[in-house]
Amino acid sequence: MKVYNLENIKSAAELKHRTEVISMNERSIIVLDTFTGIAQKLQAVSISLFHLDIEKVMNQLQDFENDCGNWLDNLLSSEMQKAEAAKEIKVHIDQISRLCNENPNIIDDHEIMAHGAMISSLILSHYLEECTKKNFILNSCHFMRLGLDRKPDIKYVKKNVEELMKACPDVPILITQSRL
């Protein structure tokens, strides 16, 4: 099994270039870091939320949604694929919005950033699908755990990843998040 670590992705062009080497001939796992621009925009949302500026948060989320649309426009040619991806991304943006409106003073910025990691995974997944590279997103929350030393519990991770992989034996490319 081949493991690809994709980090510091700043543009759709860079994502295209970095994924060209991913082979369909062997099972692969892509460990994806949140795209740089997505992380920066969501960090700004967290800062505005810390200051309890909900109006600014909502404007930033709208700008963020538009930015996600730009990623899709630059990566996907199929309007149907774009619509499907936008719909899935919107679920995460709506969840962030609800969190910000319901409990603005107790929300953890890690929760906001986790949505950014999933959105980045969705964008990559839809791009690979359009390139006819069958893939599946493994949510790292379902298999990642840190030990007492604050490092990944390798035995736990291995056992749970193997279980998740059994659910998709015919999928050559698995996508997971580097930080959730």
Each language-model region and where it sits:
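Nucleotide/pyrophosphate-binding catalytic subdomain
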Residues: 1-180
